[in-house]
Amino acid sequence: MQHVRNKTTLPKINALAAFYLITLLPIGWPVLGVAEELTGSALIVGNGPERYAIEALAKNFEAFHPKTSLDFFWHQNARPVEEVRENGADIAVTGQAEKDLPSTTVAWDGIAVVTNFSNAIEDITREQLAKIFSGEIRFWSQVYEEGPEARISLIHRTWNQNIRQPFEKFLGFENHKGIRAKIVEKENETFKAINGDIYSISYVSMGPALQARKDGYGVTLLFVDDIEPEYQTVLDGTYPLRRPVVFVMNGNASPVAQAFLEYVLSPQGQRAIKIGASGLFQDKTSSVIKYYPLDGE
């Protein structure tokens, strides 16, 4: 598995192996219909928060197929689906299916709504979120009875992180524009922004949010429609804010890419997703970033 190169052009497939993941214990995996001596490579492109989880899965896959190489290009300005369409990559990791390309949901991710810990709010409704992020509600006093007469500080996410689109779809206004808000890219930048503004509100991937709370960040994960944001509620689908993690495949994807998809969908791959990717999160602290398997177990 190769270094992720933070450039806006695709790397060649012969880069060095990624070094920043703490090794997951390999989990036994049957061959799933592919030759034991599987050889070759595949290029995976993405730009969202799924990076470490997918790389951990790739590390497991390569352990059982040592003559293969799963290479990554992961950058904020990457265009995963476009690269697949242009035959520049085998797999695009995205947050939605594409009608014209083979698309498979491989896991789920919750989206946590976060506020500053000093803000007394604990729960919020979908309707309130929609009014806040559309600008109809502008003050915390309009959200809850004890709320201060203070303007709400909106912190939006960039369009290329697979988070904003499903969040706005949940609120019922895809591609909504015209609301003034601070824009942040990475999860840890969001936590820092929330920490620095008592009246702020934003949304992040559930795994990093749960880890941030565990690590002592001053953030509150709000109940949404009376459902607690936690691993089990995302897993069983009762928590309303969740999004798919999708593999969009090149129609001419390499045998290695196809075998990797089979592995991720296998019981062993889904178990690895449930365990979580042990690695270095974006703020360089040790963490466990979990996604949610498909079977709900």
Named regions from a protein language model:
Residues 1-12:
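N-terminal secretory signal peptides that target proteins for export/translocation
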Residues 3-4, 20-21, 204, 292-293:
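Compositionally biased, intrinsically disordered low-complexity regions enriched in proline and serine
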Residues 12, 17, 288-289:
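Composition-driven detection of intrinsically disordered, low-complexity segments
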Residues 17-30:
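Bacterial N-terminal signal peptides
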